[in-house]
Amino acid sequence: MSSTKPPTTTNKRKRTSNAHDEAPAKRVPEASSSKVTLDDSQPAPATSSDAVLGARSAPGTDYERVPFSTLNLSPPTTAAIERMGFETMTEVQARTIPPLLAGKDVLGAARTGSGKTMAFLIPSVELLSTLRFKPVNGTGVIIISPTRELALQIFGVAKELMQGHSQTFGVLMGGANRKAEADKLVKGVNLIVATPGRLLDHLQNTKGFVFKNLKALVIDEADRILEIGFEEEMKQIIKLLPSENRQSMLFSATQTTKVTDLARISLRPGPLYINVDETKEASTADMLEQGYVVCESDQRFMLLFTFLKKNLKKKVIVFFSSCNSVKYHAELLNYIDVPVLDLHGKQKQQKRTNTFFEFINAPAGILLCTDVAARGLDIPKVDWIIQFDPPDDPRDYIHRVGRTARAGKSGKSLLFLLPSELGFLRFLKVAKVPLNEYQFPQKKVADVQKQLESLISKNHYLNTSARDGYRSYLQAYASYSLKKIFDVNKLDLAKVGKAFGFAVPPKVNISVGSVKAKKSRDEDESSDDDGQPKKAYYRNRGRK
């Protein structure tokens, strides 16, 4: 194979929908778990997840949809909702919007894909409209989001919702032109969507930024904001913002001690607590079919390659544990004619934005990403979620699979596990996540190992990228908090090396820092590890 530089990761191939993908076929379940074989010749049984969960009520039987027309919203907002194609409210919207319109503070808990973006945007827009905010009044609503992509998405919905209103709106986020943002703030932006770091920067340093008239603060994905290291920034932001006559809304998929602490300092005493999931028997969407596959390290890439080749006409998201691993696999797959897009925290903001919207608008395609895409993003018609590298926590699993089966639609997910990682299933069971075991017939897995090793040995650019990906995979693995399940010392490095295309695994240095390393490995907007890393040197070793 050629040793020329691999092409830039793009996805220009036009695709159409195909009903035949690599779907699980029915097998007789074992006593301890439900197993199905992944075979493209037979479709998945519609009730496969029910074998684990037992009988379930159909979506919508527990909650009767309420029309938006019952809210008595302003004509511009009503018209915008109609243009967006919405007629009735989701459960979180029906339970949240009325008290917010009445001026109450709300602490909301809802699974991803529940419609909470509209739940806080509609009251925010109505508040600005009722108070007749103008640019000279400065900022009346601030919405804080953990990631740039989610901020852009919220901004896009706000733009549609405010189309018939006179109020101004804008987005502040790291990676964007700070001076251009500051110029707009001085002119007056009534509704702001922002990431924490950039918002704090403007609050502290932008002269002429008027926020003394702030009437509403929205903190979205609060648990994620805190997880990626913005706890101190959030405390500073809340101290700087006026609290008198300010309505606050805090939304979090999980209720942790830190989220409770943040709610205490940001919300007024006695907020209304709304949890639409507490009576649900599963933590994930009703229409989501979930499975896992057990395979050794040296089989992982070949299994992924086989799956993606058979699902080129589907919309698929594949999650990895590190930026370098995403980069390597994207370069490799594009080089061998499996077109993919890639999204991770080391990319420049313009590249991330372009990739994000290209995948959203594509009828089919494959997106390789880190957890930068796991929270809150509403990507239409995703067929499969593949967790090639398992998450460190059931909450992360839930947010990853939340990219599919949204708003009552169906979807599928597949989790890759090593035999040594099966203990993670116990944690998922406690978190009310129903899973089937899937099995790939070995004869249908493409044996491309020799070709892969030949390519990596001859192509300098791919070899360097593979080495970086291999090192980062070990680095991420060593930072997992569930050490008894994800133990880097139990990895067979010879087999791990083969998955990255090495006949003999390279010698690499990895740094294992403080507990923050787990969250900084995605390098989205969180700061680098500020602990003193200890070195671990991994030589060529493998279990016999």
From Swiss-Prot:
It is an enzyme of class 3 (hydrolase). GO terms for biological process: maturation of LSU-rRNA from tricistronic rRNA transcript (SSU-rRNA, 5.8S rRNA, LSU-rRNA). A motif (DEAD box) lies at residues 220-223. Gene3D superfamilies: P-loop containing nucleotide triphosphate hydrolases. A motif (Bipartite nuclear localization signal) lies at residues 299-315. It comes from the Eukaryota. InterPro entries: DDX18/Has1_DEADc, DEAD/DEAH_box_helicase_dom, Helicase_ATP-bd, Helicase_C-like, P-loop_NTPase, RNA-helicase_DEAD-box_CS, RNA_helicase_DEAD_Q_motif, SPB4-like_CTE. Its EC number is 3.6.4.13. Its main location: nucleus. Residues 97-273 form the Helicase ATP-binding domain. One of its GO terms (cellular component) is nucleolus. Residues 1-59, 513-544 are annotated as: Disordered. CDD domains: DEADc_DDX18, SF2_C_DEAD. Keywords: ATP-binding, Helicase, Hydrolase, Nucleotide-binding, Nucleus, Ribosome biogenesis, RNA-binding, rRNA processing. Residues 287-456 form the Helicase C-terminal domain. GO terms for molecular function: ATP binding; ATP hydrolysis activity; RNA binding; RNA helicase activity. Disulfide bonds: none annotated. PANTHER family: RNA HELICASE. The Q motif is unique to and characteristic of the DEAD box family of RNA helicases and controls ATP binding and hydrolysis. Associates in the nucleolus with the 60S and pre-60S ribosomal subunits. Belongs to the DEAD box helicase family. DDX18/HAS1 subfamily. This is ATP-dependent RNA helicase HAS1. The gene is HAS1.
